[in-house]
C-alpha cells in the first residue's frame, strides 16, 4: 500500500490506482463520495477486497458519527456498522477492530484514528446493558429507525435479536434515567484532551465480557492514574478514549475457554 505523500512521488501500479483514488477522496473528508467510489471498486475488482473493506469501515463509521438520528441522538449502531438495534455480536466487533488496524493487519487509510475513537465510544455505551436498553427505547420509533445514509450492506445482523419495536415515539426527557442519554447526544464526544474526570464518566463500565470471543483477544485497560508510566507492549496503543487514558492491547488467543473482558 502507499502513504499519501509517497504515492504522489512514485509511479503508481495500475492495480493500485483505484485504491489511490479512494484514498485521495477519503483524505478530502468527503466520506459519502469515498464510500460510493470504494463500494463500486469493491464490486468491480477481482482482487484487493480486504483493502477496500478497510476504507469502507472508516467511511461508514464517520458518516454515522456525522449524521444524527431524527430525535437528535448519535447513531451509535451505525458507528459500530450495525444497520439497526440488536445484539452486539463480539465476532462483528472483532472484525471491525481488525479492519481498523487493531489486529495483525494495518489500515493505511486517512482518519483511521478518528474512526477508531468514534467506534470505541459507541461500543463503550452499547456494551453497557442498562444504557443500551435506554438507548434502544429512545430510538424505538420506526421514524428513528429509517436509514440516514449510514447503512452498511456488508454487515450481517442477527434479526432474531432485534429489540425495541412497537414502543411508540418517546421524548428523551421522558425516559427514566434519561440524563444518561446525553452521552448519545454529545456533539464531539471524542477525543477529550483534558485529564481527570470528564462528563462521559457519569457511569462506569461493567465487567460483562466486552470484546471478541475468538482469535486474538482485545484487552482494554483503563489507566486512572494520570502521569505514571504505562507498560506498553509492541502490540499496544495508548489513547484518550471516553475521557480516560486507555491502553488497548491485541493479544494472541490461548487454547483456553477464558473470555476477554474490559476492566477498569
UniProtKB/Swiss-Prot annotation:
- A GO CC term attached to the entry: nucleus
> In which domain of life is the source organism classified?
Eukaryota
Q: Which residues form a coiled coil?
A: none
**How does inactivating the gene affect the organism?**
Suppressor of the triploid seed abortion phenotype observed in osd1 and jas-3 mutants, thus leading to enlarged and somewhat fertile triploid seeds production characterized by abnormally normalized parental imprinted genes expression.
InterPro entries per the record? Answer: Imprinting_Balance_Reg
Q: In which tissues is it expressed?
A: Paternally imprinted expression in the endosperm.
Alphabetically, which GO biological process terms does the record hold? endosperm development
Q: What does this protein do?
A: Product of a dosage-sensitive gene that contributes to the maintenance of paternally and maternally imprinted gene expression in the endosperm in order to balance parental contributions. Underlies postzygotic reproductive isolation by promoting triploid seed arrest in a genetic dosage-dependent manner, thus being a component of postzygotic interploidy hybridization barriers.
Other information = In Greek mythology, 'Admetos' was one of Jason's companions Argonauts in his quest for the Golden Fleece.
Protein's UniProt name:
Protein ADMETOS
Species assigned in the record: Arabidopsis thaliana
Amino acid at each position: 500500500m502507499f502513504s499519501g505523500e509517497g504515492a504522489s512521488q512514485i509511479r503508481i501500479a495500475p492495480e493500485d490506482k483505484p485504491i489511490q483514488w479512494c484514498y485521495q477522496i477519503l483524505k478530502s473528508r468527503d466520506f459519502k463520495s469515498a464510500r460510493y467510489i470504494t463500494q463500486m471498486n469493491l464490486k468491480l475488482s477481482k482482487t484487493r477486497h480486504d483493502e477496500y473493506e478497510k476504507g469502507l469501515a472508516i467511511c461508514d463509521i464517520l458518516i454515522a458519527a456525522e449524521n444524527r438520528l431524527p430525535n437528535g441522538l448519535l447513531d451509535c449502531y451505525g458507528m459500530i456498522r450495525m444497520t439497526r438495534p440488536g445484539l452486539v455480536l463480539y465476532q462483528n466487533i472483532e472484525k471491525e477492530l481488525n479492519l481498523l488496524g487493531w489486529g495483525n493487519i494495518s489500515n493505511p487509510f486517512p482518519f483511521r484514528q478518528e474512526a477508531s475513537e468514534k467506534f470505541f465510544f459507541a461500543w463503550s455505551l452499547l456494551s453497557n446493558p442498562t444504557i443500551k436498553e435506554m438507548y434502544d427505547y429512545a430510538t424505538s420509533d420506526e421514524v428513528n429507525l429509517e436509514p440516514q445514509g449510514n447503512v452498511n450492506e456488508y454487515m450481517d445482523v442477527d434479526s432474531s435479536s432485534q429489540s425495541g419495536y412497537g414502543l411508540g415515539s418517546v421524548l428523551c426527557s421522558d425516559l427514566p434515567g434519561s440524563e444518561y442519554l446525553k452521552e448519545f447526544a454529545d456533539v464531539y464526544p471524542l477525543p477529550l484532551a483534558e485529564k481527570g474526570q470528564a462528563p462521559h464518566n457519569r457511569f462506569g463500565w461493567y465487567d460483562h465480557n466486552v470484546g471478541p470471543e475468538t482469535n486474538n483477544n482485545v484487552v482494554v485497560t483503563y489507566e486512572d492514574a494520570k502521569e505514571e508510566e504505562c507498560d506498553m507492549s509492541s502490540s499496544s496503543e495508548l489513547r484518550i478514549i471516553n475521557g480516560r487514558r486507555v491502553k488497548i492491547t491485541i493479544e494472541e488467543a490461548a487454547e483456553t475457554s477464558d473470555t476477554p473482558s474490559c476492566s477498569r
